[in-house]
Swiss-Prot record:
Gene3D superfamilies: 3.30.1390.10. It comes from Citrobacter koseri (strain ATCC BAA-895 / CDC 4225-83 / SGSC4696). Belongs to the ClpS family. InterPro entries: ClpS, ClpS_core, Ribosomal_bL12_C/ClpS-like. Involved in the modulation of the specificity of the ClpAP-mediated ATP-dependent protein degradation. The gene is clpS. This is ATP-dependent Clp protease adapter protein ClpS.
């Protein structure tokens, strides 16, 4: 009896599946956007609280947001980036600030 599945290359299928499984996850930039109302001290607080920056680095990023209109706070996987954006925006609203945090594909 001859092989009926000669056209199927199970080794190749398995190799393709492993290669697909090992692709690195998509990464996203988390960005703070400047506004005319949020105090600089609050932006520094956000950068320390949600992105674990020390006061010096948080101040540098806050100044970048202020003078350049926006700054990248970090690059994360989709789930982490979405969570950070949601947490920062919620924290800003709870403190009655219009600070906007967004994400975009890296």
């Amino acid at each position: 009896m001859g092989k009926t599945n000669d056209w199927l290359d199970f080794d190749q299928l398995a190799e393709d599946k492993v290669r697909d499984a090992l692709k690195p996850p998509s990464m996203y930039k988390v960005i703070l956007v400047n506004d005319d109302y949020t105090p600089m001290e609050f932006v520094i607080d956000v950068l320390q609280k949600f992105f674990s920056y020390d006061v010096e680095r948080a101040t540098q990023l806050m100044l970048a947001v202020h003078y350049q209109g926006k700054a990248i706070c970090g690059v994360f996987t989709a789930e982490v980036a979405e969570t950070k954006v949601a947490m920062v925006n919620k924290y800003a609203r709870e403190n009655e600030h219009p600070l906007l945090c967004t994400l975009e594909k890296a």
